[in-house]
Every structure is written in structure tokens, then in C-alpha cells.
């Protein structure tokens, strides 16, 4: 039985939890408990107890949310989504506690959880940061939308490609933060769910997803951070890149858009690289010649199409292009062959990538990332 939220007007949103193991295989009979965040009024009592089916999925449950108009009105100051906490328990695996899962009205929220084998009595606690349109984050530092790739020492890819994985540095570039290997589509879905509301018009979601993907592919194509001496693709800092939140839920409307257009990006005539399409909320921060997130919502509600929204902000010479799809994490030649006897950071990076694949495809032996190219690495 659902417990009513302590708010006035209410709408309803939906939540489904998907549970897999480290090899991405579904886990059946996982125990999933949903509760409201603990307050003085609400002592964190469970409102739903569920179990996953053979596909590792719970049934879809209805949950209370704020009114729909909160997420469609840029002048609204109230939080437009509801927060819930989720606990996932599976015998032999670490317990997962995910706090502040976001539920929007008239939207299906998807919480994907990958369980890890238990070592002792470990528990992983994940706190999802607030949405960028509700909380305040550092403003984007402006950059040129087309990077000069002809400077001495600069290395770029030979073509525009869709990587299988991106490496996300969870902080500012120079911070001592953790790096995460994330599939490209999962990264885009995470960022879009963190940067815009899933309740917005379809054309608005598509326009924003295109801007997010083009920005990301510019970082991939120019090897922006690699050329600065880093071994990651992009950061989670809004001052430098885009907001990515470890462990957060995504939304079905965004999930479907990304699956349909994930191989697209934004181009200008006679420019090979994807355009670094910068954007801002358009409310707390204004950004001439960048996409305004709230402004794009208003245009979508007026009936503007995806490309019309894009060109309204970036100009009439912006068009949609399609990239190739490749496996792994694209990188240019490091200056030496990676073969028996080679060593160093690039060998270690390759070993880490091989080990990431081996964790999913269990027929492939695991490899130790020691930075030395030996026979064990050659056999993979």
C-alpha cells in the first residue's frame, strides 16, 4: 500500500528497478524495498517491497510526485520531482542502498542496478545528486565550438566514431577523482536525465540529446583530455563538461530517444569534427549562441521540430550527421607498437579495457592491469 507524500497537490510517476550481476546477467528474486527519504515526519518506513522476475525486473509501481506543471514552468521554485530511496538485497551480493532516486510525473523512471559479489558484510551507498535544473552547479566555462587540431603535438582521430565506452572522470580534470568506464549510450542517457526533464516535448528531448552527444563526440574526436596528459574521455564537472551522476536513474522517454539517435551528432559545412555544442539552463545562466534548456522546452511546446530548435540557437548552417560505430575506446596511435615487451600507461589502459570486456564476456580470461605487455596480455 502506498503512503501519501506530505505535499499538497500530487501527480503520479512510475518506477521500475532492473537488477543484474557484474556480467550483466539478470538476477531473479532480488529483494527491492522502496521508501521515502527519512524526515522528522516520515521515519523512512517502506512503502513498497518487491522481487525481481526472471528478467531481473520488478513490476512497475506508481509513486506520488509533485504536479506535472512544476517541471514545465521555468519560473517554478518547487522541486518538480519526488525523491525515493531504494534498497536491493541479494544473497551473496553486497547490499545496494540508493538514495534520492528521482521520480517525475507522467514518466517511467528506470533504476538499473549492477550487483557486486559480497566480500564480508559490505554495503554500497549511492547518493544521487540533485538535478541541474533544480540545484545550482558551476557555470560552463566557454570554449571555442571548433577545436584547432593543427597545433603542434595535437593528435585527433582520423574519423568521427561512436565509441563503445567513454571514460568519465568524476570531478574536475585535475581532481583526484575516480574514473568510470561507461558505455556511450548509458553515458548519454545519464547526462540527459541529469540535465533536462523527461516530461518535456519529444522534439525538445531530441534537440538536447543531440547537443549532449555532439559535445561528447567532440571530446572523443579531438582527444581533448588525452592531449592534455589525462587518460579519460570527459569529466562530470558542469564547469568543464556535462553533469554525469554515478548510479543515478534514467527515464524511459530519454532512454528511447537515445536508443533511436545515438549515432548522430551536429555538424557545420566543411568541418569534420563534431561541434562542441555548449548549452545552459537559460534561467539562472544566459548563453547567447548556445542552446537554452528552458528555452528549448518552450519552443517544443510551441510545436517546433528538433532541427528547428537546434537552428534557433546554433544557426541555420547546423545540420545532423551520422557517425560510424566501433568497439572499445577510440584512441590514436600512442607512438609505439603495443606488443610483447611494451610497457607503460597505454599498455595498462589497454589491459583495463580488456579486463572490462572480460567481466561481461566471461569466456574471456581476466587480465591483470600491470602495464607490462606479456604473454598473458597477448593471449587475450
What are these regions (language model features)?
Residues 1-27, 42-44, 50:
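Beta-strand-rich domain onsets/edges
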Residues 2-8, 29-31, 51, 57-63, ...:
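Conserved, single-site charged/polar hotspot
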Residues 10-12, 25-27, 45, 79-81, ...:
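Short, surface-exposed loop/turn motifs at beta-strand boundaries within globular domains
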Residues 14, 83-85, 110:
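Broad gene-expression machinery/nucleic-acid interaction feature
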Residues 22-47, 54, 347, 351:
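Short, ordered, surface-exposed loop/turn motifs in non-cytosolic proteins
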Residues 40-72:
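Short, acidic Ser/Thr/Gly-rich low-complexity loop/linker segments typical of extracellular
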Residues 67-99:
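A short, solvent-exposed loop/turn motif at the edges and junctions
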Amino acid at each position: 500500500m502506498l503512503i501519501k507524500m506530505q505535499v499538497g497537490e500530487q501527480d503520479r510517476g512510475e518506477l521500475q528497478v532492473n537488477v543484474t550481476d557484474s556480467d550483466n546477467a539478470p538476477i531473479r528474486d532480488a529483494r527491492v524495498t522502496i521508501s521515502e527519504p527519512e524526515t522528522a515526519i516520515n521515519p523512512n518506513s517502506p512503502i513498497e517491497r518487491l522481487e525481481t522476475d526472471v528478467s531481473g525486473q520488478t513490476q512497475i509501481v506508481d509513486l506520488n510526485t509533485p504536479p506535472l506543471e512544476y517541471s514545465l514552468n521555468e519560473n517554478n521554485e518547487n522541486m518538480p520531482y519526488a525523491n525515493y530511496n531504494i534498497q536491493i538485497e541479494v544473497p551473496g551480493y553486497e547490499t545496494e542502498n540508493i538514495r534520492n532516486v528521482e521520480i517525475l510525473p507522467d514518466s517511467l523512471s528506470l533504476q538499473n542496478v549492477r550487483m557486486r559479489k559480497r566480500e564480508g558484510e559490505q554495503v554500497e551507498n549511492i547518493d544521487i545528486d540533485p538535478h541541474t535544473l533544480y540545484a545550482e552547479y558551476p557555470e560552463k566555462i566557454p570554449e571555442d565550438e571548433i577545436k584547432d587540431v593543427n597545433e603542434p603535438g595535437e593528435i585527433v582521430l582520423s574519423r568521427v566514431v561512436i565509441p563503445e565506452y567513454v571514460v568519465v572522470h568524476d570531478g574536475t580534470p585535475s581532481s583526484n577523482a575516480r574514473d568510470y568506464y561507461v558505455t556511450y549510450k548509458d553515458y548519454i542517457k545519464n547526462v540527459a536525465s541529469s540535465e533536462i526533464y523527461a516530461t518535456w516535448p519529444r522534439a525538445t528531448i531530441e534537440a538536447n540529446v543531440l547537443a549532449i552527444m555532439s559535445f561528447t563526440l567532440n571530446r572523443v574526436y579531438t582527444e581533448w583530455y588525452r592531449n592534455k596528459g589525462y587518460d579519460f574521455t570527459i569529466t562530470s564537472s558542469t564547469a568543464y563538461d556535462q553533469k554525469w551522476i554515478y548510479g543515478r536513474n534514467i527515464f524511459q522517454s530519454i532512454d528511447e530517444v537515445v536508443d533511436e539517435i545515438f549515432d548522430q551528432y551536429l555538424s557545420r559545412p566543411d568541418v569534420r569534427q563534431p561541434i562542441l555544442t555548449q548549452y545552459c539552463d537559460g534561467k539562472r545562466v544566459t548563453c547567447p549562441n548556445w542552446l537554452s534548456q528552458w528555452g528549448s522546452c518552450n519552443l517544443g511546446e510551441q510545436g517546433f521540430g528538433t532541427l528547428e530548435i537546434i537552428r534557433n540557437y546554433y544557426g541555420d548552417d547546423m545540420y545532423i550527421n551520422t557517425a560510424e560505430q566501433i568497439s572499445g575506446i577510440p584512441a590514436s596511435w600512442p607512438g609505439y607498437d603495443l606488443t610483447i615487451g611494451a610497457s607503460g600507461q597505454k599498455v595498462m589502459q589497454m589491459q583495463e579495457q580488456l579486463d572490462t570486456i572480460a567481466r561481461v564476456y566471461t569466456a574471456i580470461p581476466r587480465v591483470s592491469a600491470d602495464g607490462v605487455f606479456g604473454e598473458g596480455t597477448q593471449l587475450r
